[in-house]
C-alpha cells in the first residue's frame, strides 16, 4: 500500500504549536520499517483499551456536565416560575390597592358633596330666615311700644299737673269765707273751668287698663325676645360646631389627598420596578436560550471532530495492520523510509489533545456563564425582596389610610345625624357606583388580557426550553 491512497483531512494537518512536543520519540523504543511509514512496536489491544477508556472518560465527563447543566436549568426554571408567581401576587395586591383607592376616593367625593349640601342648607335655612323676620317685626313693635309709653308718660304727667291744680283750687275754695269772698273766688276761679269728675274716672281707668295691657305685651315681647335670643345662640353654637367639623373634615381630606398622591406615586414606582423585573427575566431567559444554542453548536462541532478523529484512527489502524502483514514478506535489509505515518499519528494525537483543551476551555466558559446567570438570579431575588418590603410599607400606609377612612366614616355618621337631607343624593350615588362598576369591570378585563398574554409568553418560553432539553439527550 502506497502513501497516495491515504486520505488526509484538515484534522490530519499538523499543529505548529504542539508538533514540537511529539517530534522527539523515545530512543529505547524500536521502530518498524514499513512501506507507508513507521509505527511503534506496541500491542494493538492495549492501544484500543486505552483509547476506549479515554473515550469512556470523556463521555462520562460530558454526561456529568450535561446532568449538572440540566439540574442548573431546572433550578433556573423553578426560580423563574417563583418570580412569575411573585409578580402575579404583586399585580393582585396592586389591583386590590387600586380598588381600595377607588373606594376611598368615592367616599371622599361623597363627603365633599355632603359638606356642600350642608353648607347650602345652612345658607338657605328657612327657620333662620323666619326667626330673622320675626326679630325684625318684634323690634319694630318694640319701637312703637316705646313711642306709646313715652306718649303715655307725657299724658300722665299732664294729668298729674291738672289734678294738683284742681286739688289746690278745692283747698283754696274750702278755706275762703263764704260771704265776702264770693267775688274773689269767682274772680280767681274764672280761668279754671270746673272739672267733671264723672268723666275723669273712666278716662283714668281706661288709661290704667291700656297701661296694664301694654305692660303685659312688653313682658310677652321680652319673653319671646329672650326665647328667640336663646334659640339664636343655640343655632350659632351649632353653626360654629358644624363649621369646626367642616374644617376638620377639610383638613382630613387634605391629608388623605396628600397620602393618596404619595400612594399613587409609590404604586407607579412599584409598577415600574415590576416591569423592570419582567424585562430582566426576559433578558435572562433570552441569554439562557442563547447559551443553550451555543452549547449545542459546540457539542455538534465536537461530535463531528470526534467522528473525523475516529475515522482517521480507523484508517491508520487498518493501514498499520496492512503494513504489519506486509512487513513479514518484505526483506529485512531495506533502508528505512520517511516516517510519514508516524508523523500523521502524532499529528492526530496532538489534534486530539488540542480538541480536549478547547473542550476544557469551553466548559470553563460555560461554567462562568452559569455563575453569571446564578448571580443575576440572586440579584433578581434581592430585587424581589426589595419589592416585597416596599409592598409591606404600602400595606402599612394603606392601613393608616383605612384608619383615616374609619375616622372619616365617624364624621360621616355625625353629619348624617345632623343633616338628614343627604338621602336625596342616593340616586346620584347609585348612578356613580354603576359607572364605577363598569370601570372596574373594564379594568378587570384588561388585567385578565395582560395576564393571559404573560401566561402565553411563559408557556412559549417553557416549551422552547423543554424542546431544547429533549433534543439534548437525542444529540448525546
From Swiss-Prot:
Q: Where is this region: Disordered?
A: 1-29, 172-193
**A single cellular component GO annotation:** ciliary transition fiber
Q: Where in the cell is it found?
A: Cytoplasm, Cytosol; Mitochondrion intermembrane space
For this UniProt record, the keywords arranged alphabetically read as follows: Cytoplasm, Mitochondrion
Which residue spans traverse the membrane?
none
Q: Where is the composition biased (Polar residues)?
A: 180-190
Q: Does the keyword Lipoprotein apply?
A: no
Q: Which superkingdom heads the taxonomic lineage of this protein's source?
A: Eukaryota
The effect of disrupting this gene, in the record's words, is:
RNAi-mediated knockdown of the protein causes complete lethality at a late pupal stage. Muscle-specific knockdown is lethal under strongly induced conditions, but shows no obvious alteration in locomotion and behavior under mild induction conditions. Neuron-specific knockdown flies show striking motor defects. Analysis of synaptic and subsynaptic organization at larval neuromuscular junction shows normal overall synapse morphology, but a highly significant decrease in the amount of active zones, i.e. presynaptic microdomains of neurotransmitter release.
GO BP term, pick one:
chemical synaptic transmission
What this chain does, per the record? Required for mitochondrial complex IV activity. May be involved in non-associative learning.
PANTHER family on file: CENTROSOMAL PROTEIN OF 89 KDA
**The protein's name in its UniProt record:** Protein Cep89 homolog
* Species of the source: Drosophila melanogaster (Fruit fly)
* Name of the encoding gene: Cep89
Amino acid at each position: 500500500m502506497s502513501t497516495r491512497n491515504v486520505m488526509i483531512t484538515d484534522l490530519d494537518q499538523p499543529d505548529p504549536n504542539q508538533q514540537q512536543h511529539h517530534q522527539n520519540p523515545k530512543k529505547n523504543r524500536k521502530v518498524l520499517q514499513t512501506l507507508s511509514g513507521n509505527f511503534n512496536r506496541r500491542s494493538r489491544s492495549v492501544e484500543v483499551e486505552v483509547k476506549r477508556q479515554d473515550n469512556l472518560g470523556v463521555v462520562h465527563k460530558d454526561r456529568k456536565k450535561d446532568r449538572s447543566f440540566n439540574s442548573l436549568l431546572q433550578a433556573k426554571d423553578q426560580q423563574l416560575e417563583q418570580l412569575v408567581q411573585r409578580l402575579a401576587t404583586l399585580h393582585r395586591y396592586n389591583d386590590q390597592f387600586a380598588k381600595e383607592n377607588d373606594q376611598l376616593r368615592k367616599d371622599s367625593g361623597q363627603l365633599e358633596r355632603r359638606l356642600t349640601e350642608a353648607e347650602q342648607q345652612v345658607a338657605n335655612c328657612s327657620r333662620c330666615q323666619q326667626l330673622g323676620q320675626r326679630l325684625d317685626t318684634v323690634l319694630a313693635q318694640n319701637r312703637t311700644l316705646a313711642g306709646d309709653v313715652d306718649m303715655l308718660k307725657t299724658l300722665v304727667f299732664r294729668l298729674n299737673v291738672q289734678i294738683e291744680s284742681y286739688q289746690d283750687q278745692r283747698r283754696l275754695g274750702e278755706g275762703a269765707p263764704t260771704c265776702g269772698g264770693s267775688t274773689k273766688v269767682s274772680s280767681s276761679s274764672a280761668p279754671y273751668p270746673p272739672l267733671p269728675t264723672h268723666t275723669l274716672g273712666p278716662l283714668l281707668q281706661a288709661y290704667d287698663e291700656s297701661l296694664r295691657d301694654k305692660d303685659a305685651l312688653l313682658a310677652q315681647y321680652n319673653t319671646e325676645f329672650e326665647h328667640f335670643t336663646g334659640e339664636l345662640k343655640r343655632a350659632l353654637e351649632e353653626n360654629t360646631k358644624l363649621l369646626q367639623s367642616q374644617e376638620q373634615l377639610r383638613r382630613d381630606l387634605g391629608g388623605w389627598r396628600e397620602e393618596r398622591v404619595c400612594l399613587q406615586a409609590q404604586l407607579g414606582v412599584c409598577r415600574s420596578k415590576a416591569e423592570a423585573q419582567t424585562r430582566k427575566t426576559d433578558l435572562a431567559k433570552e441569554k439562557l436560550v442563547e447559551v443553550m444554542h451555543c452549547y449545542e453548536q459546540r457539542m455538534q462541532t465536537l461530535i463531528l471532530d470526534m467522528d473525523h478523529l475516529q475515522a482517521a484512527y480507523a484508517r491508520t489502524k487498518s493501514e498499520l495492520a496492512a503494513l504489519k502483514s506486509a512487513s513479514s514478506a518484505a526483506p529485512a535489509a531495506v533502508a528505512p523510509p520517511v516516517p510519514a505515518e508516524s508523523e500523521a499519528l502524532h499529528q492526530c494525537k496532538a489534534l486530539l489533545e488540542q480538541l480536549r483543551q478547547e473542550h476544557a476551555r469551553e466548559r470553563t466558559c460555560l461554567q462562568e456563564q452559569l455563575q453569571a446567570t446564578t448571580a443575576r438570579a440572586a440579584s433578581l431575588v434581592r430585587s424581589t425582596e426589595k419589592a416585597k418590603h416596599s409592598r409591606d410599607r404600602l400595606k402599612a400606609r394603606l392601613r393608616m389610610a383605612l384608619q383615616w377612612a374609619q375616622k372619616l366614616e365617624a364624621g360621616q355618621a355625625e353629619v348624617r345625624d345632623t343633616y338628614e337631607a343627604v338621602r336625596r343624593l342616593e340616586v346620584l350615588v347609585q348612578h356613580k357606583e354603576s359607572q364605577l362598576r363598569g370601570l372596574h369591570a373594564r379594568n378587570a378585563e384588561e388585567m385578565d388580557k395582560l395576564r393571559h398574554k404573560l401566561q402565553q409568553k411563559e408557556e412559549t418560553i417553557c416549551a422552547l426550553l423543554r424542546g431544547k432539553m429533549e433534543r439534548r439527550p437525542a444529540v448525546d
